């Protein structure tokens, strides 16, 4: 119906008047299913982390970041003291062969073909091929990862690093191969699509949620 949206999931089917899509790695595909005309592609980049051991944690009292290089689309490895008292270091940034490719060996033929059939992906690779190769080497070499971390903390040792988590960044790429660095939100009828929410979206999630709520009230004609 014109005033209803039908959402089909693996948990059943739902009818609703309004939908806010925050699809992350699937945001572009969800928008296309809703017939939204978009000019970007979501390409996944995995980031691997190490956790500092007990003897290594005392070397980090605060957040430690490198000076970002504006020529590259990624910040680089850094040290983050977590709320639980632990310290994680990373991430690197490597192209994933599966959108939800949280493991180094994850592969999906359809996802890979989808990413590599997009001209913007190849333009990104062409501009940053050396950076990309360095990132892949670091992903499979703990000594190389350590060497990069030692640029920030020279006293760090191999035994200070323990395997940590991995995350996948939903990078929104334009057709020109440039990373879309700002928020990208599209409106269509009774739906709002959050196509891109770059860093520091997680840090600012509550404030961003308030903004999207205001957008929904205006778009859908809702009252407080």
Each language-model region and where it sits:
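C-terminal catalytic lobe of FAD-dependent flavoproteins
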Residues: 104, 110, 115-223
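Flavin-dependent oxidoreductases
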Residues: 1-108
């Amino acid at each position: 119906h014109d005033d209803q949206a039908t959402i089909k999931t693996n948990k059943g089917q739902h009818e609703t008047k309004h939908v806010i899509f925050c699809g992350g790695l699937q945001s572009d595909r969800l928008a296309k299913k809703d017939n939204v005309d978009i000019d970007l592609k979501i390409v996944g980049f995995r980031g691997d982390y190490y956790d500092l051991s007990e003897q290594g944690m005392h070397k980090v009292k605060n957040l430690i970041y490198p000076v970002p290089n504006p020529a590259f689309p990624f910040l680089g490895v850094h040290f983050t003291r977590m709320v639980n008292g632990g310290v994680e270091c990373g991430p690197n940034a490597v192209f994933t062969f599966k959108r939800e490719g949280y493991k180094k060996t994850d592969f999906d033929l359809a996802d890979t073909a989808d990413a590599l059939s997009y001209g913007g992906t190849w333009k990104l690779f062409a501009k940053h091929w050396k950076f990309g190769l360095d990132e892949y080497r670091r992903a499979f070499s703990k000594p190389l990862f350590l060497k990069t971390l030692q640029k920030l903390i020279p006293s760090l040792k191999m035994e200070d690093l323990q395997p940590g988590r991995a995350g996948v960044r939903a990078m929104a790429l334009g057709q020109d191969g440039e990373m879309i660095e700002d928020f990208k939100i599209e409106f269509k009828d009774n739906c709002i699509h959050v196509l891109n929410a770059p860093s520091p979206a997680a840090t600012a999630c509550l404030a961003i949620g308030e903004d999207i709520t205001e957008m929904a009230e205006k778009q859908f004609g809702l009252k407080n």
